């Protein structure tokens, strides 16, 4: 879960001020709960208790400071993340107090830095592996944009270990459910990501021949 715009303030202001929520309609926890409940989202209470309400499938917003967060659905610690990025939010100050907010930020800081570092390192390493395997740049960008979202994470771990079988399995599994026009005009081969193919096909002629036996071993149906 990350803010759409990085406005992090390294200091916690000690000044007193009257809190004026930017979205008054979501000041109550019931209103925030309802914003999630109507979209059939599970375990939404942790988000509404953190002062956040549902905006879209890719975005939630703090009713008080107005900060918008993306990549939120699988976040386990929304209160800590909210406080980490919006340290002078009136809701966070009222909920935890200045001392409590500072302690929470200090305890979360190590976890956050380690988590971000590991993900960044894996993305860089994975990008290099995909490049070495001959995947096209737009294809790699598409893979990395979805790679760390469950249930695809297990395939990325195999890519990091340079297992070409699982790289192909991941790419084909992902694209078989999401028919993608990578440049909005051309559809590329699901296997190599390089050769353009017709709209009603999934693989180029070379990959159809080379990978026929390979795709027969997979656990899902792929049109050859």
From Swiss-Prot:
Residue runs in coiled coils: none
CDD domains: BIR
Residues bound to Zn(2+): 62, 65, 82, 89
UniProt keyword Ligase present: no
SMART domains for this protein: BIR
Domain of life from the UniProt record: Viruses
Keywords: Metal-binding, Zinc
Pfam family, one: BIR
GO MF entry, a single one: metal ion binding
BIR repeat residue numbers: 29-92
Function field: Not essential for growth or virulence. Does not have antiapoptotic function.
Protein name per its UniProtKB record: IAP-like protein p27
Organism annotation: African swine fever virus (isolate Tick/South Africa/Crocodile Cr3/1996) (ASFV)
Gene coding for it: p27
